[in-house]
């Protein structure tokens, strides 16, 4: 017999899809509602970064991400970002600002992120990256992606680029 405290739980059922959780996060970020990322591969991800691996400068397709650093690397793996660099909803891409970031001429924010840090982040308009990890300890990060509108998903081309498959 399985003890009731040892039952299997799924993060998608117990947290990600939970209406109460989405209402709570919506209140924090000042949105009337949040919707699941309508993408079969990108709504919940676990990122692993071994020594020397990094995630280059980019913007997210989803409006919001909740991240939890499960395991910090020995060194490196620093999360860096430039807040409100563009306004994708208004079609203002700020290519000059993007160039300044890539050329090392922008003011970069580097929050303190240690193992166990839970962070809410608006990645659609904030350019961000993770620097190369150093050491044998793998950086492990869980990402939950949400949007302020329903039905938003990665394009098929993006799914193939990131995951090598469509579903």
Locate the predicted segments by residue.
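Histidine-centered active-site/metal-ligand motif
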Residues: 6, 58, 127-128
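Catalytic core of Fe(II)/2-oxoglutarate
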Residues: 83-84, 89-167
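Short glycine-biased active-site loop of nucleotidyltransferases that positions the nucleotide triphosphate
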Residues: 2, 56-58, 132-134
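Catalytic core of non-heme Fe(II) oxygenases with the double-stranded beta-helix
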Residues: 13, 23-41, 45-118
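Single conserved hydrophobic/aromatic residue that forms the stacking wall/gate
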Residues: 1-11
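Broad gene-expression machinery/nucleic-acid interaction feature
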Residues: 6, 63-65, 139-141
